[in-house]
Amino acid sequence: MFERIISFAIQQRWLVLLAVFGMAGLGIFSYNRLPIDAVPDITNVQVQVNTSAPGYSPLETEQRVTYPIEVVMAGLPGLEQTRSLSRYGLSQVTVIFKDGTDVYFARQLVNQRIQEAKDNLPEGVVPAMGPISTGLGEIYLWTVEAEEGARKADGTAYTPTDLREIQDWVVRPQLRNVPGVTEINTIGGFNKQYLVAPSLERLASYGLTLTDVVNALNKNNDNVGAGYIERRGEQYLVRAPGQVASEDDIRNIIVGTAQGQPIRIRDIGDVEIGKELRTGAATENGKEVVLGTVFMLIGENSRAVSKAVDEKVASINRTMPEGVKIVTVYDRTRLVDKAIATVKKNLLEGAVLVIVILFLFLGNIRAALITATIIPLAMLFTFTGMVNYKISANLMSLGALDFGIIIDGAVVIVENCVRRLAHAQEHHGRPLTRSERFHEVFAAAKEARRPLIFGQLIIMIVYLPIFALTGVEGKMFHPMAFTVVLALLGAMILSVTFVPAAVALFIGERVAEKENRLMLWAKRRYEPLLEKSLANTAVVLTFAAVSIVLCVAIAARLGSEFIPNLNEGDIAIQALRIPGTSLSQSVEMQKTIETTLKAKFPEIERVFARTGTAEIASDPMPPNISDGYIMLKPEKDWPEPKKTHAELLSAIQEEAGKIPGNNYEFSQPIQLRFNELISGVRSDVAVKIFGDDNNVLSETAKKVSAVLQGIPGAQEVKVEQTTGLPMLTVKIDREKAARYGLNMSDVQDAVATGVGGRDSGTFFQGDRRFDIVVRLPEAVRGEVEALRRLPIPLPKGVDARTTFIPLSEVATLEMAPGPNQISRENGKRRIVISANVRGRDIGSFVPEAEAAIQSQVKIPAGYWMTWGGTFEQLQSATTRLQVVVPVALLLVFVLLFAMFNNIKDGLLVFTGIPFALTGGILALWIRGIPMSITAAVGFIALCGVAVLNGLVMLSFIRSLREEGHSLDSAVRVGALTRLRPVLMTALVASLGFVPMAIATGTGAEVQRPLATVVIGGILSSTALTLLVLPVLYRLAHRKDEDAEDTREPVTQTHQPDQGRQPA
């Protein structure tokens, strides 16, 4: 089949070139549509169910809201896991589905079960699904700020409430219409409310209750339609408006009467524009701000959506009131652009190095150009496939592309064509005719097709194990394997179509094969080394075996991690205070952190944070926790440009540690989300303890935490804050309440309305709407003694008058700590001890920590412990690769057997793999890089290249034997003749990765292990191919030589570069 393809390509060369140009045009079109990102989105298919349950304690929230929702979710098709969190007034259930489940189908299933659960939930508690986004969907954050001295139209300064109103009613509606945006979340400032604050004394003097005020507001704030009437042939719509239009309208609402006189709201309390009882706040550089967040629709491209949002923000800014502006504080595009710049730089530099090697070794400019053309053409082919399969260009998908490996097949064919054309011209003693030239090109391509096809297939097959990865690791590495295989496939197709056609067209009548100085130098050095190797077989093989054994020992000491942490250039800082810290106190403490860090470190551009829970509780936090971002300036603007990111982080940690009242957890914006998506925790590793009793869980967790803190490398060890939330409990005495004729709900309603407030209608202002809330004045709400005097209305007597008793008559007020939060996983309560690992690898940290915990902590009966975090993914990927990699290597051997039809020669080529691995292991050890899945991908790529080198040399030695050369002659001539292609293959493959190995840009740390492994492995593999493989071949075939009939000896004057030279 391939012979016909090659023949067609040469005969129809212009048609082939036209088709290649068409493919290139499609590739350019695809490149312009190619989604670009920093890393693949590894979010599992999950649906969040958020439920607001005002006034419910964590325990009540778990019992009455979380548990019923969890129960109905059980048994959903494709359900993989449920996680839940119950906090004061909030329940969040995360339903996780198996990979491949359509997210919209998953949401439909969850919504159906929510409808079932509603009957079992308390009245007024309504679950809602979270936005259709991913865990990495927070791509753009901004603040709405007023400049110093900015004034509103009435001359007053802008308040946090005013800024929140602008955010909610001007900015948010416009940004929600940007394509790719699924939701806008807001935190900070205050939701505007019209607050009715009755005086308890005035209410009691008029015999009125808080419920009377609520009812009066509800009955005097509505518009009613009354159909229509017809009059003199015209139709009139009848309506009776009664909606309040101003604060005065609210003040004039009648609540009741006293001695025939109306009692209005203004008579019993104040009406003012008030503030909500907020659950979250935002700060930036030490001052309160309003912070907005864009949630990207799942499946969209973060760079494209961020740019569209940024353009819309610029448009909105031009329409903002004077002195008010939107300031972008986080834009994912910045990270994406820096990461892609690193990838582009590495690929471009790698391509240049590869092309230089081609020019140096081929010695023919046109031949080198034809070979080099495969690089952009294969890339354009790859881009087309990536667009069709919706794979974004990112650090992972483009991180394993090596142009040297991609063009290996083309190098083999072009070199063979040049050699045959030169030899044919020398044989005829004249320039070749066109038909003779085409014949030689066909013969050369035909000779090379077998090692080319088998070599490329072998490299593709070694990538198959990566496709066996599942879950998070699968989502990270599948794109990488896909793009490499696609590029190799494109290069292979081009090698048997474009390359023969281009050689036939552009390599002219006069072809001279001449060796450059570099090759002559290499041969002069190689020939004596080869002779010494052949003369000292035992020494060479012993050295090779010892090298393998030593590297196996080194490999056991390398350590391991899932993937290297991407240096995002910014820092995430989470500040934790003791449970019960109020929101206002947390905000003040956070301001101190921000002002201190901003003043101490000129490298910091800004510090901003979210404290508590935002409007959409996608990431619920209690008021004692602040989730902060430290945005750094570009390194060129640092006062000390040589200062490393790690040194700056260490200095920031030290300075922050001096501020009292806070514990910290440091991470990076994407890394933090990455860890959280993996196992529901934000740290590198986590110990999860499961059981029933919260107190037992808490006590056990403290013991485990103490052990973890003693393990070298453990930092920021903390136990999930499950207890210690201060609670003021109104304990109602049923007997006393019954004596006064009161129901429990009568007392509860009075407390709930007075302290928590009650919505009593809506105030409309154009298309804006604000709640009207009845709540006691802050002076009363904040005083325990005042609450004890809260009037509780008694049932009306015969005179229809309302009488009151103080709350203290039927209830006591008790202050005691209660549960802070309750976490559950797969229907069971759990507590998490989290830790970040620095200065060592996770792979060695976890076994040491596990052994220490087992020896020092006794887990109670009925309770159990598991590990979470990135270690979980490392174990999963390692287990799967241990099964699949041997299968792939077996397939490689089967291909080698098919190539040679000889088990012995197949095994000889196969020995290239362990020698390649030794070089990769040694390179990692020298550079101090632990083993990771990224490094494992490098070893996988290495296996293909190592086998390809051996294939090139052994196939030629076999051909010489078939021509009648003696064993020693075939080995020597074959090794010297194939020195050039072996060195070219090794150099282009390794040099293509050199920029990746030494790069320092954003994302370089992710690619570095892979590149290091390939470079080190190719060096050792090349040494094997050039020195050990000839020794092994002669040793393996010595008996065959002895058994053969005596041949005519081949003279030593044979020149290795003459005669038939198949690839």
UniProtKB/Swiss-Prot annotation:
GO CC annotations, alphabetized: plasma membrane
Region of interest (Disordered), residue spans: 1040-1063
Organism domain of life: Bacteria
Comp. bias intervals (Polar residues): 1049-1063
Keyword Cell membrane: yes
TM stretches of this protein: 14-29, 350-370, 452-472, 487-507, 534-554, 883-903, 906-926, 937-957, 982-1004, 1013-1033
SUPFAM superfamilies to which the protein is assigned, alphabetical: Multidrug efflux transporter AcrB pore domain, PN1, PN2, PC1 and PC2 subdomains, Multidrug efflux transporter AcrB TolC docking domain, DN and DC subdomains, Multidrug efflux transporter AcrB transmembrane domain
Location in or out of the cell: Cell membrane
Keywords for this protein: Cadmium resistance, Cell membrane, Cobalt, Membrane, Plasmid, Transmembrane, Transmembrane helix, Transport, Zinc
UniProt GO BP: response to cadmium ion
Signal peptide: none
Membrane topology value: Multi-pass membrane protein
GO molecular function: monoatomic cation transmembrane transporter activity; xenobiotic transmembrane transporter activity
Family label: Belongs to the resistance-nodulation-cell division (RND) (TC 2.A.6) family.
Task performed by this protein: Has a low cation transport activity for cobalt, it is essential for the expression of cobalt, zinc, and cadmium resistance. CzcA and CzcB together would act in zinc efflux nearly as effectively as the complete CZC efflux system (CzcABC).
Stored PANTHER family: CATION EFFLUX SYSTEM (ACRB_ACRD_ACRF FAMILY), PTHR32063
Name of the protein: Cation efflux system protein CzcA
Lineage, uppermost ranks: Bacteria, Pseudomonadati, Pseudomonadota, Betaproteobacteria, Burkholderiales
